[in-house]
């Protein structure tokens, strides 16, 4: 993740933003600012997860679609 922000730190910050928004004590402007920040953090986290998934698939030589197909065949 960019600027040295780690995935776990981003998740923690995102959880705090959700708590603040759920309380409903922020002004409209503060809520919008926090919402925007939360969306940005969520996108970064999703990108990090996608990259990790791709790396795992590359390292293991598997594709999630192939695994699903083989699971379906064995359960029939």
From Swiss-Prot:
HAMAP family: Exonuc_7_S (MF_00337). Disulfide bonds: none annotated. This is Exodeoxyribonuclease 7 small subunit. It is an enzyme of class 3 (hydrolase). Bidirectionally degrades single-stranded DNA into large acid-insoluble oligonucleotides, which are then degraded further into small acid-soluble oligonucleotides. One of its GO terms (molecular function) is exodeoxyribonuclease VII activity. It catalyses: Exonucleolytic cleavage in either 5'- to 3'- or 3'- to 5'-direction to yield nucleoside 5'-phosphates. GO terms for biological process: DNA catabolic process.
